[in-house]
Amino acid sequence: MDTIAARALTVIKACNTLKEVRIVVESNVLEILGIAVNRYNGLTLRSVTMRPTSQEQRNEMFYMCLDMILAAANLNVGNISPDYIQNLATIGVLATPEIPYTMESANEIARMSGETGTWGPDRQPFGYFLAAPEVTQHGRFRQRVGQNVTTSIVSSTLAQVSMNAGARGDIQALFQNQNDPVMIYFVWRRIGTFSNAAGNAQDTPQGVTLNVGGVNMRAGVIIAYDGQAPVNVNNPGLGQGMIEIEVIYYLSLDKTMTQYPSLQAHIFNVYSYKNPLWHGLRAAILNRTTLPNNIPPIYPPHDRENVLLIILLSALADAFSVLAPDFNLFGVVPIQGPINRAVAQNAYV
């Protein structure tokens, strides 16, 4: 399937070079389009030309691009337009070994397949304590009954530790049972003045410490923590004290936007508003997938099918901009006048 996707991407990118009618195209573009268009026309009985000039010819070339991304993504959109009918024979065109694919497209698909098929540590965009259902006021001493050391979540990146006088304890549990981290990078600081249980201001004694695996860590210095070693805090003073723990970032095997080059830019290109036709077409295609129709996904796509579809749809979005197709789509009402921010804003609400 990688070769089919590489051919589809190659053909669409070749079509995207036809910005001007009289442009002198590269020889490899002529070779790619010459073979692809002939094969496509022969199997589908359509009449795509290599030099589209009229609106009808531009539509036909865009239909070919659309057929190819649907075939490569193994999607069937059904009846979405009175003017366009998906040609299921297109998969036979892309399976033709005579159609060449470029080194660039082959490398893109190889990277996509390789990265979506494995896992690697990457910096996560969300705070480590994002899933905490409850937070505590920052700088407010809080001690659970029967404990001398209590940890509390303040925000998605901040936690604090309340310690009784002379208290010592392991706070490793603060980092456990969440996010499956490979490495956590955090800083701890002494809270100089805090509010005690009665609401009065109180100073944290000097000499409070934090150690990881038995090694004391300096306050205000980033600590690389693997989540396995014990994390002990100690308040040797005669009064209550507090420290703050800020998780700067953490690494885990969850997929991010950096799993594939320019994935975030591809997603923006797919979900950007070009006109009502593109807005409706994108929704009609994504409606057959697990990706959102109109709003980018909260979490990065991580499986091969969705990442491949984003790459192919981004190339199709470029073809849409270059070929400027104009056809009817069920449920889409054309608008009059230029596209501005207000028009785009209205499309997403």
From Swiss-Prot:
Location in or out of the cell: Virion
Residues with glycosylation annotation: N148, N287
Keywords: Capsid protein, Glycoprotein, Outer capsid protein, Virion
GO function terms (MF aspect): host cell surface receptor binding; structural molecule activity
GO cellular component, one term: viral outer capsid
Disulfide links within the chain: none
Function statement: The VP7 protein is one of the five proteins (with VP1, VP3, VP4, and VP6) which form the inner capsid of the virus.
Chief place where the protein resides: virion
Protein name as annotated: Core protein VP7
One record GO biological process: fusion of virus membrane with host plasma membrane
Family matches, as SUPFAM superfamilies: A virus capsid protein alpha-helical domain, Viral protein domain
Organism name: Epizootic hemorrhagic disease virus 1
Pfam family, one: Orbi_VP7
